[in-house]
């Protein structure tokens, strides 16, 4: 504790600002710059976008004119071009959390150069998120619903043969009417989506799902069903609710037939749109940097990028800071972004003198670029690479409170929901 008074305790912004001001001559910048507040930054971004769009509307360069018109047609409304400006703002702000924003953009655009079914987007993002995070819950729902409804039918028809596929059980169709066929289609379609490994399979399963599973009005759909109307209505409500939820969850998929779906994802238009978005975002970035340079103003994100550049390009300065700090203690590590983590890594001693404190459950700054997956990856390292200390003991609450919290967290937190596995290690303990 006696060393606390001499510790260099700062926010990441304050630390980087001091580093940059102390080394302005190495970076080749004017040390008298000022930091913009949020409103100033927003106004300068808006002004830069206005100037950029005005120039592109009037350009005589045919290639640039065509690219800009394509983007306006794709993202702007019939009233104004604010939709396209919003895309540029959002993308620009997002990439600032990476050490090299422009390189990150070009690297991601390059993923679309090859066949889409072989791209990182499809293999890692689409298949992983779509199948594991969205469809797992729905698949379990339909299986449970079918089992429950078959159980009811068996009470009425004890000799029902349940060894055949559900759709082939005549007693179920007789008892539940048309709804039974639709429920079986939903269950099979979700299973097909979960096992899909190609765009053809995804398109076909999704096409079947949206085209053939609308139950219709209760009166018409109930026709010929033997079940009591109240019982039938209960299950039809569950059916319609989950079906609408699944359609909402997969709303990012293009509507239409499997053929249209595949045409979309394999089209050159998709690749061209991505290239054009990168092109105009890079143009904006260059103009925005020039505008800030003229006013001699910077954002805290600029300061972090300058600090990163200083450490990555100057070994002597990097070593100076590395020797200065025996330990690097980072609080709220779950809200660190890729740029900040890279700065910490550069001035550490091969990561061996870093101590990170954080809680994935408290990650609330993704909208500002915080990336909790950085903490998650460190947490998953082998034990010989990192030491993990679990701060799970709670000395301020009664066991009744702790047990209630653990019950709620266990129910709502899993690897599939929230990226947090609330197991016995993560659970709160009294003693």
Model-derived features: where do they sit?
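Short, conserved catalytic or adaptor-binding loops enriched in Gly and charged residues
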Residues: 1-2, 242-253, 378-384, 431
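Conserved ATP-dependent motor core of P-loop NTPases, especially the RecA-like helicase ATPase domain
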Residues: 1-193, 197
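Conserved helicase NTPase motor core
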Residues: 8-13, 17, 33-46, 83, ...
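Conserved AAA+ ATPase "sensor/coupling" helix adjacent to the nucleotide-binding pocket
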Residues: 23, 48-55, 378, 404-412
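Short coil/turn segments at secondary-structure boundaries
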Residues: 30-35, 58-72, 101-109, 156-172, ...
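Coupling/switch/interface segments within P-loop NTPase motor domains and analogous charged loops
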Residues: 58, 62-86, 100, 174-285
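Helicase-core coupling region on the C-terminal RecA-like lobe
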Residues: 79-86, 90-93, 390-431
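Short amphipathic alpha-helical segments
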Residues: 385-389
């Amino acid at each position: 504790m006696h060393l606390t008074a001499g510790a260099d305790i700062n926010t990441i912004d304050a630390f980087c600002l001091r580093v940059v001001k102390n080394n302005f001559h190495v970076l080749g910048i004017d040390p008298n710059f000022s930091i913009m507040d949020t409103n100033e930054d927003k106004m300068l971004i808006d002004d830069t976008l206005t100037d950029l769009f005005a120039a592109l509307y009037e350009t005589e360069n045919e290639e640039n004119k065509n690219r800009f018109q394509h983007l306006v047609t794709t993202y702007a409304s019939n009233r104004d071009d604010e939709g396209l400006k919003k895309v540029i703002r959002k993308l620009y702000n997002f990439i600032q959390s990476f050490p090299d924003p422009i390189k990150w953009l070009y690297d991601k655009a390059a993923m679309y150069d090859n066949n889409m079914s072989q791209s990182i987007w499809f293999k890692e993002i689409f298949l992983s998120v779509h199948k594991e995070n969205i469809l797992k819950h729905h698949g379990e729902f339909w299986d449970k619903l079918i089992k429950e409804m078959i159980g009811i039918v068996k009470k009425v028809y004890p000799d029902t043969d349940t060894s055949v596929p559900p759709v082939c059980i005549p007693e179920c169709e007789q008892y539940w009417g048309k709804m039974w066929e639709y429920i079986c289609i939903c269950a099979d379609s979700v299973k097909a989506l979960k096992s899909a490994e190609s765009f053809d399979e995804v398109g076909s399963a999704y096409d079947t799902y949206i085209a053939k599973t609308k139950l219709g009005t209760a009166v018409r759909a109930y026709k010929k069903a033997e079940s009591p109307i109240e019982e039938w209505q209960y299950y039809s409500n569950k059916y319609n609710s989950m079906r609408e939820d699944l359609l909402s969850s997969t709303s990012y998929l293009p509507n239409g037939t499997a053929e249209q779906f595949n045409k979309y994802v394999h089209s050159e238009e998709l690749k061209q749109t991505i290239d054009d978005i990168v092109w105009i975002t890079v143009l904006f970035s260059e103009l925005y940097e020039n505008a800030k340079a003229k006013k001699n103003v910077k954002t805290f994100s600029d300061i972090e990028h300058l600090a990163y550049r200083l450490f990555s390009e100057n070994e002597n300065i990097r070593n100076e800071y590395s020797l200065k700090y025996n330990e690097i203690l980072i609080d709220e590590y779950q809200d660190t972004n890729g740029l900040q983590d890279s700065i910490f890594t550069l001035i550490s001693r091969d990561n061996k003198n870093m101590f990170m404190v954080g809680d994935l459950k408290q990650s609330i700054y993704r909208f500002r670029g915080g990336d909790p997956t950085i903490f998650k990856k460190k947490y998953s390292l082998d034990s010989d690479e990192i030491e993990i200390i679990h701060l799970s003991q709670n000395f301020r609450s009664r066991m009744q409170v702790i047990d209630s919290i653990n019950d709620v967290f266990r129910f709502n937190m899993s690897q599939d929901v929230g990226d947090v596995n609330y197991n016995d290690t993560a659970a709160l303990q009294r003693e």
